[in-house]
Amino acid sequence: MLKFIQNNREGTALLAILTLFALLGIIDRNYFSLQTFTMIFSSAQILILLAIGATLVMLTRNIDVSVGSITGLCAVTVGMALNAGFGLVASCLFALLVGMVAGFFNGILVTWLRIPAIVATLGTLGLYRGLMLLLTGGKWIEGLPADLKSLSTPILFSISPIGWLTMLLILAMAWLLGNTAFGRSFYATGDNLQGARQLGVRTDSIRIFAFSMNGVMAALAGIVFASQIGFIPNQTGNGLEMKAIAACVLGGISLLGGTGTIIGAILGAFLLTQIDSVLVLLRLPAWWNDFIAGLVLLGVLVFDGRLRCAVERNIRQQKYARFTAQAIISDKKPTVSDNNPAASNKKKAAL
């Protein structure tokens, strides 16, 4: 059972989502509807985008805790560019470029300067957050044009253009990681860095690419945030890094690298967003969200560690059981002298 759960984390997350849907459907019959599903998906888009980027980084056995700050910085970038008179496309592209540069800088710190990822990104978390506050003077950005809001306006099947782009990115990343040699390089890098290098994998390039794409996904999340609410607070992005990591771990992405899928991370993000909707349904204050996210992350990490230890212990027991069985069989196996009395008599005579 434990081995099944360990090997089917995506299915476990999906089962948890369906179970929660069923329970909430019993409490409120209007909850179980297509409208509710699309509403949760719309709310989950920011976390889904962050989970996609975090997956790439975590697969390489690294972690990035600066994505919340990058999200806020890029949201401020697109807002300031729009208020300065730039077009929507140019402003969004500029924000994506800022996110990519921020992620690339993280990758340089980790890959070339050999700074541990958690230490490097803790530093850039403060750096990017401080830069965001310097640009805004600690004030909110308001008065954004209506064009930005249109990105989150439903157009087809109650899904916005950003929603369709998010689904396209999910499919593209799932295909990339599961069906290409480049995608498998992420798993190889995280599973065994030295072994991957000996096989010809450009591990430094893979890790820098992972951090850069993480920055791009954070920038896109910042654009989604600005388009959904129509203004940019001075604390945009706070706490999102914890939720992104929690979503990935919940969906089966290992902190030790080399294990997990994009689909699992997406299901984890969807489940966390669904939990937030439960808090709204129960009319709990908004500040419970971070507490619940931290509690879920801690619980999943403890469960994941205990589950991994139990599976490894079970595998060791099976190995030792086979070894013991083979030893017993070899001890009971008759020798040549036992089957041949004449050979036994000759041996005794020789003695």
Curated annotation (Swiss-Prot):
Protein name: Autoinducer 2 import system permease protein LsrC
Primary location recorded for the protein, binned into one broad class: membrane
An example Gene Ontology molecular-function term: transmembrane transporter activity
Pfam hit, one: BPD_transp_2
Domain of life from the UniProt record: Bacteria
Subunit structure comment from the entry: The complex is composed of two ATP-binding proteins (LsrA), two transmembrane proteins (LsrC and LsrD) and a solute-binding protein (LsrB).
Subcellular location: Cell inner membrane
Ranges annotated as spanning the membrane: 14-34, 39-59, 70-90, 93-113, 115-135, 155-175, 213-233, 252-272, 284-304
Keywords for this protein: Cell inner membrane, Cell membrane, Membrane, Transmembrane, Transmembrane helix, Transport
Family, similarity comment: Belongs to the binding-protein-dependent transport system permease family. AraH/RbsC subfamily.
Gene, per the UniProt record: lsrC
CC annotations in GO: plasma membrane
